[in-house]
Each structure stands twice: as structure tokens, then as C-alpha cells.
């Protein structure tokens, strides 16, 4: 006996690909909001399945710099690799959402983020392949960004703030 799939039934991979696409393009604040967006595309999903999908994708809910309601984000795995176009656009978006403050010392820009968001911001900086950045180190809520000579840390902090 052959089972035919209805329009609301999708493979796990296809469903997860849509979840990544939605989370990359919209600020989703809850699982019910995500389920509604999927339903709009004809993908019906239970809360338990959605929760499992988010966990498998490594999605996390992060608060923005304004401290407001958190939004879901997925890791960089599907994002542009270092130096590929699109990395700077993503960096600008993340800076505007996550940058709380910027300071500097010598050749370092010190960026503050909400708790748990520093690694996402550091990864976006690395992947943007900015010619004036040597590299990053991220903690929980702080990113050290090393400026390439002759740029100073203060100039780098100012440049990154202007990308928001």
C-alpha cells in the first residue's frame, strides 16, 4: 500500500530548511509564532516537533541590545562563509540587534552584547572578512576584536558602530 503525502506533510530536512530560512529573515519571538509562519507556508507542525527541530538546528533565543523580548537565531552553519558576499549585510543586522556598547584599548575594540550573544556576533565579524580585522575572541557577553595595523582599536570600534 502506497501512502501519498498531503501538502501539509514535509520531510524533516525540508521543514528544518524552512525554519532556518524563516529565522534568518524574520524576528521570531516564540515557537507559536514560528508554527504560524510555517502553517502560512502549508507546513503543519506540533509544538513537540518544532521544539525538537529547533534543538537539532542549534537555535537559541537571544535578547537584543534593547533588552526586550528575545528572538530565535540559528548558528552560522548555513550562512555565508568567510569572505563571501552577504556576510557584511548579516554583520550589520547582528550589530544593530546585539551591540550594547563599544570601547577600545590599543588595537582592540571591545564590544558588549546581551548575555549569550557574543559568539554569534564574533562569528559574524569573522565571516564578514573585513580587511581591517585580524580576528575575534568571544566570551559570554564580550567580544575582543583585533584591528589590523595601522588601524587603532578606537577607529575599529567606531567603524563597527557605524555598520549598525
UniProtKB/Swiss-Prot annotation:
Stored InterPro entries: Arg_repress, Arg_repress_C, Arg_repress_C_sf, Arg_repress_DNA-bd, WH-like_DNA-bd_sf, WH_DNA-bd_sf
User: Which keywords does the record carry?
Assistant: Amino-acid biosynthesis, Arginine biosynthesis, Cytoplasm, DNA-binding, Repressor, Transcription, Transcription regulation
Q: Which domain of life is it from?
A: Bacteria
Which SUPFAM superfamilies does this chain map to? C-terminal domain of arginine repressor (SSF55252), Winged helix' DNA-binding domain (SSF46785)
Q: Pathway membership of this protein?
A: Amino-acid biosynthesis; L-arginine biosynthesis [regulation]
Q: Name one GO molecular function term.
A: arginine binding
Gene Ontology biological process terms from the UniProt entry = L-arginine biosynthetic process; protein complex oligomerization; regulation of arginine biosynthetic process
What subcellular locations does the record give?
Cytoplasm
The yes or no answer to whether the keyword Nucleotide-binding is present is: no
What functional role does this protein have? Regulates arginine biosynthesis genes.
The UniProt similarity line reads: Belongs to the ArgR family.
The protein's name is Arginine repressor
Annotated organism of origin: Mycolicibacterium paratuberculosis (strain ATCC BAA-968 / K-10) (Mycobacterium paratuberculosis)
Amino acid at each position: 500500500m502506497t501512502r501519498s503525502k498531503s501538502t501539509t506533510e514535509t520531510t524533516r530536512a525540508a521543514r528544518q530548511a524552512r525554519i532556518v530560512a524563516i529565522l534568518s529573515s524574520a524576528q521570531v519571538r516564540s515557537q507559536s509564532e514560528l508554527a504560524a509562519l510555517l502553517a502560512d507556508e502549508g507546513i503543519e507542525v506540533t509544538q513537540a516537533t518544532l521544539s525538537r527541530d529547533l534543538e537539532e538546528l542549534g537555535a537559541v533565543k537571544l535578547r537584543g541590545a534593547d533588552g526586550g523580548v528575545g528572538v530565535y537565531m540559528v548558528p552560522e552553519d548555513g550562512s555565508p562563509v568567510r569572505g563571501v558576499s552577504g556576510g557584511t549585510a548579516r554583520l550589520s543586522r547582528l550589530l544593530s540587534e546585539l551591540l550594547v556598547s563599544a570601547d577600545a584599548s590599543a588595537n582592540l575594540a571591545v564590544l558588549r552584547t546581551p548575555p549569550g550573544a557574543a559568539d554569534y556576533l564574533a562569528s559574524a565579524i569573522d565571516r564578514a572578512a573585513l580587511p581591517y580585522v585580524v580576528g575575534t575572541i568571544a566570551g559570554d557577553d564580550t567580544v575582543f576584536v583585533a584591528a589590523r595595523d595601522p588601524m587603532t582599536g578606537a577607529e575599529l570600534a567606531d567603524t563597527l558602530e557605524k555598520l549598525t
